[in-house]
Amino acid sequence: MATKKAGGSTRNGRDSEAKRLGVKRFGGESVLAGSIIVRQRGTKFHAGSNVGMGKDHTLFATADGKVKFEVKGEKSRKYVSVVAE
């Protein structure tokens, strides 16, 4: 015989998988061409020199060098560049 009353059901208990977004290579770090620098939703960071942008807004190095983050422009946008060593 059951010693506990039947529990009701719930409509909660779900969550989406983490997408592992964010900065992958920080300022001053050396990168090779093709290295992912930032994974993002939208353009939180914009592509500077020697940096390309994928269709999902991922920023990647197009040349070997060191990563440089800078804020510039009238709208104070954050740019990511790769400076050749």
Curated annotation (Swiss-Prot):
Region feature (Disordered): 1-20
GO CC terms in record: cytosolic large ribosomal subunit
UniProt keyword Ribosomal protein, yes or no: yes
PROSITE patterns: RIBOSOMAL_L27
A GO MF term: structural constituent of ribosome
Keywords: Ribonucleoprotein, Ribosomal protein
Biological process, per Gene Ontology: translation
Assigned protein family: Belongs to the bacterial ribosomal protein bL27 family.
Protein name: Large ribosomal subunit protein bL27
Organism: Histophilus somni (strain 2336)
Gene giving rise to this polypeptide: rpmA
